[in-house]
């Protein structure tokens, strides 16, 4: 158990937990943001999240049970829709690092909102398990999150950063000024997070 405590209370682990919690809060507040502010903040928090995830110390699973899942399909969909609403027509981008791209003659379309919601789901489940304060489950959630970063959401994060960079810096004639304040039409008061 000593090794477990060293990993979960390591400086890099604690910093990752802090940034992951900040990311989750940022995504949960997305529906209140204007696109420009949202994109600017995302382009600051995503590289930090990537850096902190890459510094998580090596760890090994110690439990045999699956960890509790906190983010429901409804929660995921609410986050995805909120980000899609903020991004508007700039939510879509062309994926160039998809494995199927080698066999495709046509571009593969992805959505910033789906990528950010996928990252959110993994991190929110991690944060919720970590907040329970049980060393064994904290360790396992950290190990699983590190594994998912390497295999899944790390690549989505950098792909999404590329798309967000394009939204911020690519001057497009298709984008009109009214598009910048997309959240003003958001009026669905039913959407609440079950776990908050």
Show which residues each predicted segment covers.
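Intrinsically disordered, low-complexity regions
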Residues: 4-6, 14, 40-46, 105, ...
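Phenylalanine-focused residue identity feature
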Residues: 9, 16, 26, 38, ...
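Long amphipathic alpha-helical segments
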Residues: 58-127
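Charged, amphipathic alpha-helical oligomerization/scaffolding segments
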Residues: 11, 15-22, 41-48, 52, ...
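Surface-exposed polar/charged interaction patches
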Residues: 23-33, 48-59, 82, 86-89, ...
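Acidic, proline/glycine-rich low-complexity IDRs
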Residues: 107, 122-196
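N-terminal interaction modules that seed assembly of large macromolecular complexes
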Residues: 2, 7-8, 14-72
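Residue-level recognition of alpha-helical structural elements
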Residues: 34-38, 112, 134-138, 142
């Amino acid at each position: 158990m000593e090794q477990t405590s060293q990993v979960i209370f390591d400086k890099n682990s604690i910093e990752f937990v802090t940034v992951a919690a900040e990311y989750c809060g940022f995504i949960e507040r997305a529906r209140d943001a204007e696109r420009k502010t949202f994109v600017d903040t995302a382009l600051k928090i995503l590289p930090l999240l990537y850096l902190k995830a890459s510094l998580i110390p090596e760890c090994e699973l110690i439990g045999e049970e699956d960890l509790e899942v906190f983010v429901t399909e409804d929660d995921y969909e609410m986050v995805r829709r909120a980000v899609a609403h903020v991004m508007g027509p700039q939510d879509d981008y062309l994926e160039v690092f998809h494995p199927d791209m080698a066999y495709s003659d046509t571009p593969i379309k992805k959505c910033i909102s789906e990528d950010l919601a996928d990252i959110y789901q993994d991190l929110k489940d991690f944060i919720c398990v970590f907040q329970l304060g049980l060393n064994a489950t904290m360790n396992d959630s950290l190990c699983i999150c590190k594994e998912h970063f390497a295999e899944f959401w790390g690549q989505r994060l950098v792909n999404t950063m590329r798309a967000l960079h394009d939204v911020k810096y690519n001057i497009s004639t298709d984008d009109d000024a009214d598009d910048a304040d997309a959240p003003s039409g958001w009026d669905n008061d039913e959407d609440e997070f079950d776990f908050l």
